[in-house]
Amino acid sequence: MSGLLPSRLVDNQEIINLVEHHSKGVFQGDLPKMLKTIEKLLNKSGIETRYWLNNDETPMTLMKTAFNSALAQANINKSDIDLLIYASVTRGFIEPANSTFISKALGLNCRNYDAVDACNGWVTAMDIINSKMKAGEIRHAMVVNMEFGMSEGGPGVPQNFTLHSADELDYKFPSLTIGEAATVTILSNESPDNFNFSYINRPDLSDLCTISLPKWELFCNEEDIERNAPTGGQYQFSSYAAALHDEGKSELIKVFYQHKIPVNDIHQIFTHTASPKMMGLVGEFIGANGNLYNIGNKTGNIITASVPFGIADAIEQGKVEKGQFCMGWVASAGMVFSALSFKL
């Protein structure tokens, strides 16, 4: 496994400065008061910094570097890879699959496709690969996660840093927590029974976190339109954080217990990085005090790269070793809640 962050360090004060810059002149109300509210919300989330692309960096270059590192760790040739899954939220193409451009960049001719499942993308890709390995269809597979959505003109900048009213913060605030990252996970079929997966699906909450495309209203329910209308069709990230957290806490706890693994048997639990403090509170509830590995305070919310980057970071820091029993624990838009357990 390999994970890389871009080099531009962005702290919370820079985020506040960006909001002030983009909102000055258009905000209807007390802007200094709103900036104080943002500061409090960022502190409440537990996120202190995040990393964005510098001017001399590209997602493809970082991905290639991560791939070369992961391939060296796996001690295989790239021609041994039978399947590549691109499992990110951020992407450049609806058609063809983004995986085709990744395969082209890496000189791969294996079967490849995208798995789209919001922040749960990596878990879903791992589940697909695990099923294919159990069926004896593939020997080696790779998951690529490239979360790079903070460049100008993307789903968050500048539109979600531009506040016209206090009400907009309800669905724009999560953009202020986003970081960027690239991860590559390579798997072999040596132990096809290594992974176990549990899920809870709540499609009734699908309108809480979206990035919609033109004519989006043709592809949802009438009751979904009101919440999505402010950003509908604009390729703009919309996420109602308060509602997500209210619903997410109980479902995260449920999916953990549904997995039926005693918390004391788990060496490290790798979590979604959306809100380190919220995950910490949920972790305390299940008794996961010393074994919750959440690097969101330094990375920000790195979306689908959260769990794989956490694993790669823990390996690099000497926090986990081969053979230790671990878990991934994710709350995602959709909403989807997942737990997967495995030995490294």
Task: Label every PLM stretch briefly.
Residues 64, 90-92, 101-137, 245-254, ...:
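Claisen-condensing/thiolase-fold acyl-transfer catalytic domains that form or cleave C-C bonds
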Residues 33-40, 57-74, 244-260, 309-314:
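Short, well-ordered amphipathic alpha-helical segments that serve as non-catalytic structural scaffolds
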Residues 37-40, 93-107, 151-164, 221-227, ...:
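Acidic-glycine-rich active-site phosphate/pyrophosphate-binding loop
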Residues 116, 141-147, 187, 328-331:
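Short beta-strand segments
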Residues 1-55, 166-242, 343-344:
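Condensing-enzyme catalytic core mediating Claisen C-C bond formation in acyl metabolism
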Residues 79-87, 264-272:
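Short glycine-rich phosphate-binding loop at a beta-alpha junction
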Residues 137-178:
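Flexible, glycine-rich active-site loops centered on histidine and acidic residues
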